[in-house]
UniProtKB/Swiss-Prot annotation:
Any single biological process term in GO: reductive iron assimilation
Domain of life, per lineage: Eukaryota
Membrane topology designation: Multi-pass membrane protein
Species: Saccharomyces cerevisiae (strain Lalvin EC1118 / Prise de mousse) (Baker's yeast)
Binding partners and assembly: Interacts with ribosomes.
Designated name of the protein: Probable metalloreductase AIM14
Gene Ontology cellular-component annotations: plasma membrane
EC number, UniProt record: 1.16.1.-
Length: 576
């Protein structure tokens, strides 16, 4: 009898082929747990600096509440990396860990997409999307670096293995070649995201950022073995779809009603929009995002929109913006340069725009309802955030102390805001008291003819800081050092002045020129009042360049005072 030949069956996949599937699910579960923890933190967490705790403990508590990237990313990646090295040998089964890097990068994308939703209905009550901008910036970079390392390590592994053809592995195998293309795209994105490159041409970065993200989401399932179509591709595509729907459903056509500008003296301008573009109620300090393109235009989706803080209150008859326009002009040619400068964005009456949506400020709800001892300090275009807050608290009967400090470079900026108040019939005299006041500090000469030699940055887009957190803005040269008497612009014939130059609000607004500025001196009454009221009733708001925000944060940490800060380029001259 003839024996039948021996048939040997070879497994299509090695025993480690499916080793990372459970790890991908684990990362997804950690992402969900992080979101739940974040929602609980913002709903029940304490951001108030305790007067009985140490300054270090208060700082950690605030950074945790404020979604500081260093702390939150540290917690998140500690959780996802704890089981990263498990069971398999790093020397003999290194492929498992190289594949695990790739799955980790893709499994983290749903969390990143979810946190950047505008609006985010799950976290809307206690968070705004602006709270996540620093986190998103660093989280995105880490995800792309992990994905890039996955590709680089595989190329190195194949290159040093004499038993493997690099060409056959990398080029001839379709799914590996797709991965190689993804790596090239990710590398290009990382190059474009480097600070100098991003600031030089933010629009290029923004286009590359969006296109590479979409390519990464759609091409990775073709490359991945085993597949990631469910649940990761499904989740990512669903979240992308929600992003698209948000930019369609909430968008409205927009026309500029009026624009008040005097480029020969200042690049601070007042823009008026129709009241009907916003809902009946919006919080003081809210902002809008505007695109110069219609929704059917591909550039609406490819290029960034521009955020502007609303200087009005919900009860006003119009929506007003007080913004700084980027200028690279030489003296005497402001208008021409502003209009022709390709690296700037300006709102003009003769053009149509699209309002993408309105967004609440990153201000806790209890501040509006419980605040009775309020200080607001702002610089330059930060007045657009400070003024509606001042008006809101000014109209409240239970407010015991209210002071707004505005630091500017020349008197023309004050004139423009004064004109805005007059045009809208905004006077404060009927409810005026000794504990409610506005102080305006001018670093230059106190004269209506003073002309500011603007120090500007060649900015590609008014949006770059707001999107990615690079600190370049029109108010950055408004340094606190300019308000020290020895550093202020000096003129031997111009004495220090302190005036209340308006008839309507003369006893409310005090304008000071060439006075040295010390925050602790200006807020003595505020600090004294804070010791007599509940800690939740005392708040300091600050909006301006980084030097001003750092000064405000230090003051609040030292005095154990609640604070909310915002960078000026959020305000509108946005390159936020």
């Amino acid at each position: 009898m003839k024996e039948s030949p021996l048939i040997t069956l070879v497994k299509r996949h090695s025993e480690t082929h499916f080793a990372n599937i459970k790890y991908g699910y684990y990362v997804l579960i950690i992402s969900l747990v992080y979101l739940i923890g974040l929602a609980l933190l913002r709903a029940f967490g304490r951001r108030t600096p305790s007067r009985s705790s140490s300054a270090f403990k208060n700082k950690i508590i605030y950074r945790l509440y404020d979604i500081d990237p260093a702390i939150h990313l540290g917690i998140l990646f500690f959780a996802v990396l704890v089981p990263f090295y498990y069971h398999y040998s790093l020397t003999t089964q290194s492929t498992v860990y190289l594949k695990r890097l790739g799955r980790l990068s893709y499994a983290l994308i749903p969390l990143n997409l979810f946190l950047t939703l505008r609006p985010n209905w799950f976290l809307r009550k206690n968070c705004t999307y602006t709270d996540f901008i620093p986190f998103h910036k660093w989280f995105s970079r880490i995800i792309t670096v992990i994905g890039l390392l996955h590709g680089i390590f595989f190329i190195i592994k194949w290159a040093i293995d004499d038993n493997v053809s690099l060409k056959q592995k990398l080029i001839l195998k379709t799914f590996n070649f797709v991965g190689f293309i993804i790596s090239i795209l990710v590398l290009f994105l990382l190059i474009c995201s480097i600070g100098p490159m991003r600031r030089y041409n933010y629009r290029l970065f923004y286009i590359v950022h969006n296109l590479v993200n979409v390519a990464f989401i759609l091409l990775t399932p073709i490359h991945s073995r085993p597949g990631v179509k469910f649940p990761f591709l499904l989740l990512n595509c669903t979240l992308l779809f929600i992003h698209i729907i948000n930019r369609i459903v909430f968008a409205k056509s927009l026309m500029i009603l009026n624009k008040n500008a005097n480029y020969s003296k200042t690049n601070l301008v007042h823009v008026r929009l129709p009241r009907a573009i916003l809902p009946d109620y919006f919080e003081p300090g809210s902002h809008i995002r505007i695109s110069p393109y219609r929704r059917i235009n591909p550039l609406y989706w490819l290029l960034p929109s521009h955020p502007y803080t609303i200087a009005s209150l919900a009860e006003d008859n119009s929506i007003d913006l007080i913004i700084k326009e980027t200028s690279t002009a030489e003296p005497g040619s402001q208008i021409e340069s502003l209009r022709s400068n390709p690296k700037s964005f300006h709102l003009d009456q003769e053009k149509n725009y699209t309002l993408i949506n309105s967004y609440p400020p990153s201000v806790p709800e209890e501040c509006y309802s419980q605040g009775t001892n309020i200080a607001i300090i702002c610089g330059g275009s930060g007045i657009s955030f400070a003024l509606p807050l001042f008006r809101h608290f000014f109209n409240k009967e239970n407010v015991k102390y209210l002071k707004m400090i505005w630091l500017i470079k020349n008197y023309s900026e004050y004139e423009l805001v004064l004109d805005y108040l007059k045009t809208n019939g905004l006077t404060f005299e009927k409810k005026l008291s000794n504990n409610k006041r506005i102080s305006v500090f001018i670093s230059g000469e106190y004269t209506a003819e003073t002309r500011l030699d603007e120090i500007t940055t060649n900015i590609d887009d008014e949006n770059s800081e707001y999107e990615m957190g690079s600190f370049n803005n029109e108010d950055e040269d408004l340094s606190i050092s300019n308000f020290n008497s020895e550093n202020a612009d000096s003129n031997d014939n111009t004495p220090e002045t302190s005036h209340s130059p308006t008839k309507e609000n003369g006893s409310l607004i005090e304008v000071k020129s060439k006075h040295s500025f010390t925050l602790s001196n200006e807020l003595k009454s505020f600090n004294n009042e804070s010791a007599q009221v509940n800690q939740n009733e005392t708040w300091l708001f600050s909006c301006g360049p980084p030097s001003l925000l750092q000064l405000s944060k230090k003051y609040c940490n030292d005095e154990r005072i609640n604070f909310s800060v915002r960078l000026t380029d959020y305000e509108g001259k946005r390159k936020e």
